[in-house]
């Protein structure tokens, strides 16, 4: 089996997404030290919901598609989310968030849309849909995490342990691209529609940007924040 078709599909999707990507105002604010600490708390609380959801979604995908290479990819992603959750705990502690603050956090729709769509894909998507969407989103997510980690160190006094969650996601695990392409190709070989994968990638990228845009609402003069509980993190 060759992966030429998968590579061409992913390349085309990445080129399309590059034309739609907009500035990430929240990451820019963190990078320059202008994001309020309460918005960092909102980021942590949002991820405390997103990461376990993604972990369950990937575990479900591994059960839906147990045969290699898909089963291997999705199981490894579920395990990786488990590691990420432990790193996230260090970020939460560095911000001084206690159990009461976390439990009173009111989730924002824009911050949970990404995880909700990943869960939808886990239930309804094909293996190539999921793999293309994740591979295409990888560059943006990784670059955002790298910039946040650097900004947190430089401007907020957080050490490597505290920013480990973002450093963990700043680069893909070894072999992830190759394994992902193999999953895409196996789906294409089985007759899965390339356009469905393109559509999934576009939607996931929109939801990725919506996550960060929601965190930046009211800080950049663009948009208006959604209602949330008084005194709680966004």
Model-predicted segments: where are they?
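Acidic, low-complexity proline/glycine-rich segments
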Residues: 1-27, 105, 109, 174-178
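Active-site-proximal alpha-helical scaffolds that flank and shape metal-associated catalytic sites
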Residues: 8, 69-171, 206
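Alpha-helical bundle segments that constitute or directly flank the non-heme di-iron/ferroxidase center
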Residues: 12-21, 27-64, 124, 129-146, ...
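Small-residue-biased structural context
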Residues: 23-28, 34-38, 97, 150, ...
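Secondary-structure edge/capping motif, primarily at the C-terminal ends of alpha-helices
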Residues: 61-65, 152, 156, 187, ...
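Transmembrane alpha-helical segments of integral membrane proteins
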Residues: 177-186
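Acidic, carboxylate-rich catalytic segments that either coordinate divalent cations
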Residues: 192-234
């Amino acid at each position: 089996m060759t992966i030429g078709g998968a590579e061409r599909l992913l390349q085309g999707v990445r080129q399309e997404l590059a034309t739609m990507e907009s500035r990430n105002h929240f990451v820019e604010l963190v990078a320059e030290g202008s994001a309020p600490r309460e918005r960092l708390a909102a980021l942590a609380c949002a991820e405390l919901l997103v990461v376990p959801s993604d972990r369950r979604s990937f575990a479900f995908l591994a059960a839906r598609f147990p045969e290699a290479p898909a089963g291997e990819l999705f199981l490894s992603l579920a395990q990786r989310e488990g590691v990420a959750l432990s790193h996230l705990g260090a970020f939460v502690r560095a911000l001084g968030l206690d159990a009461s603050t976390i439990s009173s956090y009111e989730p924002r729709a824009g911050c949970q849309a990404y995880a909700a769509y990943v869960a939808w894909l886990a239930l309804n998507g094909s293996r190539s849909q999921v793999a293309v969407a994740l591979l295409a989103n990888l560059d943006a997510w990784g670059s955002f995490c790298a910039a946040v980690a650097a900004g947190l160190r430089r401007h907020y006094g957080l050490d490597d342990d505290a920013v480990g969650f973002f450093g963990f996601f700043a680069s893909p695990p070894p072999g992830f691209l190759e394994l992902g392409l193999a999953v895409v190709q196996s789906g294409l070989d089985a007759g899965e529609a390339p356009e469905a994968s393109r559509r999934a990638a576009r939607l996931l990228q929109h939801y990725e940007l919506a996550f960060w845009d929601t965190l930046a609402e009211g800080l950049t003069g663009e948009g208006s924040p959604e209602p949330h509980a008084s005194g709680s993190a966004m």
